[in-house]
A protein has these predicted regions:
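P-loop NTP-binding core
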Residues: 1-288
Length: 288
């Protein structure tokens, strides 16, 4: 059974999509079978994996959640390349899922049940969650074994974290123990700038841990602000493949390529730390 990990923060602009896709690529390159699920109507993860989103798509997460579509009918290949990792795309229609789900019985368990037939095909299923606490995000949390909370390096990064912790504790306390084993795997700081502002955010998070007993710990790996992360997303790919695309025929190009490889290396380090935290300490095989 694949380990299901949601990248979750009810705030936007914290690097959820970038972290989900690049972590998936890092794990895939280590030899793990990976499925990404884009649970955000903005569809940034889907776009990074080469999908053009429109309302005419009929095999997406929206149909899984609201129309009873089987998960394996909505699985695509990253960049449509053989041997790449898989994904289930989002759709603009996913915005309608909140109202559609509100009247459905067992609405919070739809994704969990839909993934059961395919989970044995993957080592990891990574979910890119929307910046909201609605039914779609609840489905992601109920389907997950672990949560990773990306936080940007701004001083107020932990504002609103209390709502995530509250929802997490509510799920853990549900009758019939529907997902009592859910864990917060950790908090990863992204978009880190050189000015050191993230130290304030780290201190604030440490205070909340001590004062309120928040679960989870901060990942040692930090994702530095890097122009290549924005550029790779704009070119609808991950930073690993983007770095490979860049020419190295002169000093400027070689320097740019090296900059992009630094970002890729940070996500590789994050993937390794994830493996350690979930008890899978060594890559099973390298695709390189």
């Amino acid at each position: 059974m694949g380990k299901v990990i949601s990248f979750l923060n009810f705030k936007g602009g914290v690097g959820k999509s970038t972290s989900t896709v690049n972590t998936a690529k890092a794990l895939h390159d280590m030899g793990y079978q990976v499925l990404v699920i884009d649970a955000d109507a903005q569809g940034n993860s889907s776009k990074m994996m080469g999908k053009k989103l429109n309302d005419n798509l009929t095999e997406t997460l929206y149909e899984i959640l609201t129309k009873g579509l089987e998960a394996d009918e909505a699985i695509y290949l990253d960049q449509e390349k053989e041997g790449s990792f898989n994904y289930i795309p989002s759709s603009p229609k996913l915005d309608n899922a909140e109202s559609d789900l509100s009247s459905m019985v067992g609405r919070e368990f739809i994704l969990k049940n839909a993934l059961k037939p395919v989970s044995q095909d993957y080592d990891f299923i990574l979910i890119d969650c929307a910046p909201s606490s609605g039914w779609v995000s609840m489905n992601a949390m109920m389907a997950s074994d672990y949560l990773i909370v990306p936080l940007n390096g701004e001083p107020f990064a932990v504002d609103g974290m209390g709502k995530i912790i509250q929802r997490y504790k509510e799920i853990k306390a549900l009758k019939n123990n529907f997902n009592e084993d859910l864990q917060i795997l950790g908090y990863v700081f992204t978009l880190i700038r050189k000015c050191g502002l993230h130290d304030d955010a780290k201190a604030a998070l440490a205070t909340q841990h001590e004062k309120y007993g928040w679960p989870g710990s901060i990942f040692n790996t930090e994702i530095k602000q890097n122009v290549c992360l924005a550029e790779s997303g704009a070119r609808r790919t991950n930073v690993f493949d983007y770095a490979e695309m860049l020419p190295d025929n002169n000093f400027m190009n070689r320097n740019k390529k090296a900059t992009c490889m630094k970002a890729a290396e940070q996500y590789k380090e994050l993937a390794m730390e994830i493996l350690q935290r979930v008890g899978m300490r060594q890559p099973i095989e390298s695709n390189e």
